[in-house]
Structures are given as C-alpha cells and as structure tokens.
From Swiss-Prot:
PROSITE patterns associated with the record: CYTB_CTER, CYTB_NTER
Annotated CDD domains: cytochrome_b_C, Cytochrome_b_N
Gene: MT-CYB
Transmembrane segments: 33-53, 77-98, 113-133, 178-198, 226-246, 288-308, 320-340, 347-367
Note: Heme 1 (or BL or b562) is low-potential and absorbs at about 562 nm, and heme 2 (or BH or b566) is high-potential and absorbs at about 566 nm.
Its biological purpose: Component of the ubiquinol-cytochrome c reductase complex (complex III or cytochrome b-c1 complex) that is part of the mitochondrial respiratory chain. The b-c1 complex mediates electron transfer from ubiquinol to cytochrome c. Contributes to the generation of a proton gradient across the mitochondrial membrane that is then used for ATP synthesis.
MF terms in GO: metal ion binding; ubiquinol-cytochrome-c reductase activity
InterPro entries from the UniProt entry: Cyt_b/b6_C (IPR005798), Cyt_b/b6_C_sf (IPR036150), Cyt_b/b6_N (IPR005797), Cytb/b6-like_sf (IPR027387), Cytochrome_b (IPR030689), Cytochrome_b_C_euk/bac (IPR048260), Cytochrome_b_N_euk/bac (IPR048259), Di-haem_cyt_TM (IPR016174)
Similarity remark: Belongs to the cytochrome b family.
Subunit structure: The cytochrome bc1 complex contains 11 subunits: 3 respiratory subunits (MT-CYB, CYC1 and UQCRFS1), 2 core proteins (UQCRC1 and UQCRC2) and 6 low-molecular weight proteins (UQCRH/QCR6, UQCRB/QCR7, UQCRQ/QCR8, UQCR10/QCR9, UQCR11/QCR10 and a cleavage product of UQCRFS1). This cytochrome bc1 complex then forms a dimer.
Name of the protein this chain belongs to: Cytochrome b
Species annotation: Dobsonia minor
Membrane disposition: Multi-pass membrane protein
Keyword flag Transmembrane: yes
Positions of heme b b566 binding: H97, H196
Amino acid sequence: MTNIRKSHPLFKIINDSLVDLPAPSNISSWWNFGSLLGICLGIQILTGLFLAMHYTSDTATAFQSVTHICRDVNYGWTLRYLHANGASMFFICLFLHVGRGLYYGSYIYTETWNVGILLLFAVMATAFMGYVLPWGQMSFWGATVITNLLSAIPYIGTNLVEWIWGGFSVDKATLTRFFAFHFLLPFIISALVVVHLLFLHETGSNNPTGIPSDMDMIPFHPYYTIKDMLGALTMILALLVLVLFSPDLLGDPDNYIPANPLNTPPHIKPEWYFLFAYAILRSIPNKLGGVLALVLSILILALMPLLHTSKQRSMMFRPLSQCLFWLLVADLLTLTWIGGQPVEHPFIIIGQLASILYFSLILILMPLVSIVENHLLKW
C-alpha cells in the first residue's frame, strides 16, 4: 500500500514542498530566513486578527480602542506588542533574506526574485498602513507626509492624493480604508508567498558556492526541518525578550500622544525599517526627484540580474565584491541612522553622500569590480 503522504492529492503537495523536497546539502543558516518569514507572517496574521476584534477604525475612538486593548482585554498588551514588534522581526528577517540573495547570487532565479520584490513592496505597504491605525501623532503626520508625496506626480498628483485620502486631509475616511487594506494585504502576501515558493521549487534552492548542487541533494526532512526549528526558536525567543522587556524600544514616544492636526511633531519620521529609504528621499531637494529616488531605492533590486557581470554566481570566492557588499551594508546602516536625525548640518550632507554611494555601489562599482575579478582569474 502506498504511503498516504505520497498518494493523497493534498498531502502530496505538502510532502513535495516540505518533506521529500531535494535540498542542497551545504546550505547555511542564511537559508533559514524564508521559513522565519513564514512564521512572522503567521504571527502577524494571528495577532492582527485578535487585535481587529477589539479595534475601531474611527478617528474619535481609534486611539482609545488601542488603549482599551492594552488595559482591559485579556493579554491585549501582549497581542499589541507582539504585533508591533513582530513587524520589526519581519523586516529584520526580510532585510537579511534579501541580503543573502544579493551575496550568494540568488537573483539569477529571476522569477522567484521578482515575486520577492513584489512581496517586499506589499509588506512595506502593509506596515505603513498599520502604523497609521493607532492614530497617534506620528501615525497621523506620517500618513500625511508619505501620502502627500504622491502629489509630486505630474498632472494627476493632487487628485490622486485627495482620492486616497477620501477628502481634503487625512481623516476618518483615510483611517477606515487604511484599516480595510491593512487587513486585506496579508492575505494577498500569503498568496504571493505561494507563488514565490512555486517558482523556487521549479529551480531548487541556490547554495553558498553558487555551483549547481544537483549531484548532492538531501531530503528536506528531517535535516532542514530541525534546522528551521532551531532558527524559529531563536527568533521567537528574541521577539519575546523584546516584547516582555522593552516593548517600546523600536517605537516612537510621539505615538502615545493622540493625533492632533493642529500640532506638528518636531520631527516626523517613519518606523526604523523605513528610515534608509526616508533618508534617500530627504537627501534630494526636489520633491519629484526625491519620490523617484525613494521608489528606485527598492526597485533597483529588479536590476540585479541585469547588473550581474561576474562569471561566478556567488560572492563566496570574490573578495573584492565582498568588500563592496559590506560597504553597501554599512552605507544602509548609515542611511538608517541619518533618516532618524533632524534635517540640519552635518546630517544633510552625510545623507546625500550616503545616497550617492548607495546608487553608485549597485549601479556602477559592483558590476565593474566583477569584471575586474573575471580578468584577475583569467576568465
């Protein structure tokens, strides 16, 4: 008799994706982040669902409903902080996952990579709208500033912004639609995740060497299931430490002040995971130019397969490219720091230099250094 896991139509799909899936024998812990992102998504959907049961998307009661969740709902504070800090864990895993893809040349699988970029945009949109929901000062002003950027689009800009707002300012209509989209998007993300995995399983996983591993595969279970469980345990432990010891570490104190359209906070800034893009936006004095740079700072990832000039796939054996990669990481950390600083000297010039370096590294320096490495290896 055939094993039900291999004969049942539904179990067969799960078996081929999680149990009998052939995986390279040498993939390191950098390959753990896919499963960690799946766990993050699960945590966010579950905690979000329970929060939505108590939240009201009305400007008069939104702030109060979040206070009610924290004070009166059983373990409501846990749900709220798990959800808020879960988003931070989500982005930490996302950035590491994308960084792994850049370092080891995973972008050569263009379909998987492009769906991944779509996922990144979808998660960023979801996080932005979620930040607006508590209706604190930073929620309101963050929503006003970021949506207002669309007015830089020629001809249709102003109409587009008012259409998104549902009026002439960020108000009740905006909050209600943001809540609706914030609830809907994670399910769209889940569908995109399935497509992402579908494309990945067409080609199989890449590995640290970048050399095809068809001749040396091992079953996913038990080897990588146990490895993923260790990663999951580590991440959940880190999340719980954050939630139970310093839940407001990554938040903004201004968001504990109810939204007030008549009082602008001294420094409007988004959550930490958007600061690098925010710094790039602010470093260009022109509004439309800033918006284009903001979008391109993420969309530039789509050019990675075209900018790959090396004869080797991975950076594992390319020390010059490795140096530039870590320079890029340092540059992104610098941009993140600058995004959280006020717009004054010397932060303005540091931000502008870091932005120039960011685009130069990806578009010019890394492809050139790859060509140099090819010649050094006489390829």
